[in-house]
Amino acid sequence: MQKLRVFLLALAALCISCEAKYFATNCELVHELRRQGFPEDKMRDWVCLIQNESGRNTSKMGTINKNGSRDYGLFQINDKYWCSKTSTPGKDCNVTCAEMLLDDITKASKCAKKIYKRHKFQAWYGWRNHCQGTLPDISKC
């Protein structure tokens, strides 16, 4: 029991030290997406998707969906297919959902690209409902 208590305290301390990232502007987000290797020709789509899915906040956890699943992080990656709710990486992206909430978006970006490769932007309701034909101007970024 004592070992469990120590482990939980260490885990809590680790979580406190992990801060989520909020991208204050579209340009700040664009610079990070470029760093992550997102293609320029789809950049406006990615920015719009992220604005509408997570509000540019890596720590965003969606409400529980009708099917019992939940969406996580900047790209709102779903735990039914893509990330594992346990501490063991799994599902199609071989990551934990907790990793989707980190300020380092490397794993979340890789997973989002995998989702896009399979389903394009249609995989995200935020893009479907708000971005088709209405993309942000990022020309000054």
From Swiss-Prot:
Molecular-function GO terms, alphabetical? lysozyme activity
Q: Which domain of life is it from?
A: Eukaryota
- Disulphides: 27-141, 48-131, 83-97, 93-111
Q: InterPro entries, per this entry?
A: Glyco_hydro_22, Glyco_hydro_22_CS, Lysozyme-like_dom_sf
Q: Which GO terms describe its biological process?
A: defense response to bacterium; killing of cells of another organism
* SUPFAM superfamilies on file: Lysozyme-like
* Keyword terms: Antimicrobial, Bacteriolytic enzyme, Disulfide bond, Glycosidase, Hydrolase, Signal
Q: Which residues form the C-type lysozyme domain?
A: 21-141
**What's the catalysed reaction?**
Hydrolysis of (1->4)-beta-linkages between N-acetylmuramic acid and N-acetyl-D-glucosamine residues in a peptidoglycan and between N-acetyl-D-glucosamine residues in chitodextrins
Signal peptide from the UniProt entry: 1-20
- The active site of this protein is located at 53, 71
Per the UniProt record, which EC number(s) apply here?
3.2.1.17
As for family, the record states: Belongs to the glycosyl hydrolase 22 family.
Q: What does this protein do?
A: Lysozymes have primarily a bacteriolytic function; those in tissues and body fluids are associated with the monocyte-macrophage system and enhance the activity of immunoagents.
Question: What is the name of this protein?
Answer: Lysozyme
List the source organism: Trichoplusia ni (Cabbage looper)
